[in-house]
Amino acid sequence: MEVLFFEEVRNLFKHCNENPSLLEGKYPEIKDRLSKCCGKGQGTGNKATDHEASFAKIVEDCGFMHIQVGDQITKLSYIYQPHGTQKSIDFRLVSPSGKTIDIDLKHSENDAIFLNDGKFLTDVIYVISFTRVLKDEKVKGQRKCPRQNICTIVLGQDVMTPKDVASLEKRYARLRELNEEAKDLDFLTIYARNANQYSCKQFTTEFNTNSLEKTMTFLQ
């Protein structure tokens, strides 16, 4: 069963990488089903997105069954938002033997994704889908440049450069200091948060090929 599990997971990520347009679909029934796992909050953060529903469709087409946290695992399955909404890890793939793979989705209609207060986590597989504008392929007389859907499959530890990691950690250390200072107030509440973005320009064809190979090795 473990061999089958990792084989299906590898096939899943290869399929996403080779067919990025599949992550742009509309599956309202799946979206509604996933949203029911998010609680009763009214904000958009408590609702599944079209992007997440598209990924769930791909996962289900690869033979994984949607289950809830605490359900008995009798076959290849997946859990949506295993840690709750607004937290890292969007999907967890699980096998009856107890093996798990954690996945986080990042999606953008341009060439940058939002990290906000988050960061790329070690041994989490990121499915980063975005749209690249092909400025060099613009047709004369047309106002808009061609656009290309791209899906990067990458382990969290393989994303950021050492320079960027050091800068982000320094930033978090400063935020912790600011939040400690904010505790010693009378009536004022101060929030020190991030609104960080990450450029998709890093995700070249060469980067995507190498990161997919590293992910496949991780899944052996």
Segments the model singles out, each with a brief description of its role:
Residues 1-89, 93-101, 107-220:
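Nucleic-acid endonuclease domains
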